[in-house]
Amino acid sequence: MSTVHVVAPVAVHSVPPAQLLPQTATPPAYAQTLGGEAASTLAQKKKSPPLSANKRKRSETADDSTDQESNTPSRKSRDGPKKKKANRACFHCQKAHLTCDDSRPCQRCIKRGIANNCTEGHRKKAKYLLDDEELEELKRKQNTVPSRKSEPRTEKPKPSEPPAQTAQAPAAPLPRPSLQAQAQPVPISAPAPIPASTSEPFAPNDPMFNLTFDSNFPFGSEAANLEYTILSAILGNPSPPDTTSPPPQPYPWPSDTLSFNSPQLDSFSSFPENVLPVISADNLLSSTGSLNYLQARTAKQQSTADPADLQCGDDASKYTRDGRCSSPPSFYMDKESAARTLLSPPPTDSPGSATSTVPLNEVAPFPRPGSHLQSITDRVKAPYDYTEGYHFLMKHLTTRFEKNDILRVVRALAIFRPSLIALQMPLSWDDEVFVERCFQRSLLELDKLISYSGTPTVVWRRTGEICLVAPEFCMLTEWSMEELMGQKKYIYELFENQSVVEYWENFAEHAFENTTQSVYSHCVLLKPSGAPVPATFCFSIRRDLFDLPSAVIGQWLPLL
């Protein structure tokens, strides 16, 4: 049977009937039909507050705020007043992305000791904040930069040129120098007079500032072409006149007018492939003008000129329309002597010339490196025979050394000779020719290095044959350069017997070692008279492309 709970009556005089039970309350009849457990569960649900969407958050009381402050850590208080944000930072603080202030100089710059340089920083304005005038100025700047890059260079004729030459001179081909830059060693008309009171070194209308840019020079960049044009103009024009002296008088040209077929223009318009135009500065600066220069160059080149050139007269004033030579005069030099023309100006017989009087046949050799390389290729047609050097060594040992010394040298040769033979076996004829050309090429570089050093130096092959000798070595040993270089001379012929044995033993030990290391030893050199010259000795071994010892560089210092 179900248990029936009797509920005591409650006075409800002051409570309205609607508020007596909630809307979700269970009817009493239904509660009576439930069991005990279900009734207790229902009572607990009635005690819990109903969920509503408009539930408000409980306002914090003073006790709650004190609890939260006690739980959170207290912040560190600032020392002094809070820094005010600056309207605009100075240049240094802006660059370093540091905080600045409104004072100038700012405190940070004062601490860093750069208060004198504390200035307002530059702030770039956004495009949408720019005014119409500022936008137009910005567009104008952007348009001027590419227009300057794409603007072609316009050629202007030099003020000193005659109208006939500018109009009738043909355009020079690509490998030919500029006619306007080099065809005028002396201006035809007198330059504009410069006032004596001016302080500028050059006049504003000086032709040097109005050079014609010629793109026909065979260089890869415009800067190199312009530089070559300026250098050509410097060599082709006299120096600026003195401000205190009157301007020089113009030099007269031949009486007839220059035409397209005149010899003066023909000499500049015909450029063979194997010659280079060279203009001497001393002749151009001489007081006799450009005609003396033509006379000097013609007299200089008579020995090497073509037969057709020799038929022409030496005097440049004879070049008229009636008496014109079919070929230009000998005005240029070949490639080998082009480099030394500026160093040794051509001689002339004119009394007013300022050039040096060097005999025609006494010209210091100053060939170009390209001619040396070409001569090496033309000269070296077969590989070098090293067996001849070893045969001479064996003959020299038997005539000069004792048996024990000969055995020591032979043992040293037996150490590295098998390695040389093994490395030479796979080489072909062309490989050996290439090795010899490389050796001759390396001698050019070594000759240059020896000229920079004041130490007695000799370069020889692995067989001992001398290839290069420094003048200091000749001074040390009293051997002449002709005796050492003119005929086959071996380095061990200049050594004392003990030094020869020690050299070959050291060479056998270091022939295939590191080439960056040098061998230091004591050596006794012999003069032509047989007098000994004790010295300290060091040598290093250079190997070729196939790892064969090719060149030996030795240096000596005398023991005083």
Swiss-Prot record:
Pfam families: PAS_13 (PF24990). It is found in: Nucleus. Signal peptide: none annotated. PROSITE patterns: ZN2_CY6_FUNGAL_2. GO terms for cellular component: nucleus. Gene3D superfamilies: Zn(2)-C6 fungal-type DNA-binding domain (4.10.240.10). GO terms for biological process: cellular response to starvation; gluconeogenesis. Residues 442-515 form the PAS domain. It comes from the Eukaryota. The keyword Nucleus applies. Residues 163-187 have a biased composition (Low complexity). InterPro entries: ERT1_acuK_gluconeogen_tf, PAS-like_dom_sf, PAS_13, Zn2-C6_fun-type_DNA-bd_sf, Zn2Cys6_DnaBD. Coiled coil: none annotated. Residues 44-58 have a biased composition (Basic residues). This is Transcription activator of gluconeogenesis ERT1.
